[in-house]
């Protein structure tokens, strides 16, 4: 597999896990504005080495998910801000421009040190 993007969660905002009950996980790179950081999983920003698109594999820790849809600005947001909203609902069309949809259950064991990655499953 080819890694398109990889980063590590460094801290978790006080209200970040609240979105998990709505099947969402919101990320932002270190240095996010304080009012946003409270709601985000903060990570050390990695380099985006390819395009985000359906068919990639998203992984978080030991969990693996197929990417089913990518919003029109999700790739730019990830590249520039380290920001992406992940939805664990398997939709085939992005609900919002900044959303990446994946199929599978919401992870319940996210902690600082968890590795987040997008990978191409084709060589």
Curated annotation (Swiss-Prot):
- The source organism is Shigella flexneri
Q: Which Gene3D superfamilies match?
A: Phosphotransferase system, glucitol/sorbitol-specific IIA component
**Domain note:** The EIIA domain is phosphorylated by phospho-HPr on a histidyl residue. Then, it transfers the phosphoryl group to the EIIB domain.
Biological process, per Gene Ontology:
phosphoenolpyruvate-dependent sugar phosphotransferase system
What GO MF annotations does this protein's record show?
kinase activity; protein-N(PI)-phosphohistidine-sugar phosphotransferase activity
Report the residues modified as Phosphohistidine: 43
Task: Please describe what this protein does.
Answer: The phosphoenolpyruvate-dependent sugar phosphotransferase system (sugar PTS), a major carbohydrate active transport system, catalyzes the phosphorylation of incoming sugar substrates concomitantly with their translocation across the cell membrane. The enzyme II complex composed of SrlA, SrlB and SrlE is involved in glucitol/sorbitol transport.
Q: Which GO terms describe its cellular component?
A: cytoplasm
Q: What is this protein called?
A: PTS system glucitol/sorbitol-specific EIIA component
The gene from which this protein is expressed is srlB
InterPro entries given for it?
A: PTS_IIA_glucitol/sorbitol-sp, PTS_IIA_glucitol/sorbitol_sf, PTS_IIA_glucitol/sorbitol_sub
The subcellular localization recorded is: Cytoplasm
Query: Pfam families given for it?
Result: PTSIIA_gutA
Q: Which residues form the active site?
A: 43
Q: Which UniProt keywords apply?
A: Cytoplasm, Kinase, Phosphoprotein, Phosphotransferase system, Sugar transport, Transferase, Transport
* Domain (PTS EIIA type-5): residue spans on this chain: 1-116
């Amino acid at each position: 597999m080819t890694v398109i993007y990889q980063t590590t969660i460094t801290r978790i905002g006080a209200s970040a896990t609240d979105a998990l009950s709505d099947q969402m996980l919101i990320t932002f790179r270190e240095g996010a504005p304080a009012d946003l950081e409270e709601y985000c999983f903060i990570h050390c920003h990695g380099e985006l080495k390819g395009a985000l698109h359906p068919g990639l594999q998203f992984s978080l820790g030991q969990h693996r998910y197929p990417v089913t849809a990518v919003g029109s600005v999700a790739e730019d947001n990830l590249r520039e801000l380290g920001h992406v909203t992940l939805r664990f609902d398997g939709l085939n069309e992005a609900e919002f421009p900044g959303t990446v949809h994946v199929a599978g259950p919401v992870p319940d064991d996210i902690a600082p040190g968890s590795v987040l990655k997008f990978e191409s499953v084709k060589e």
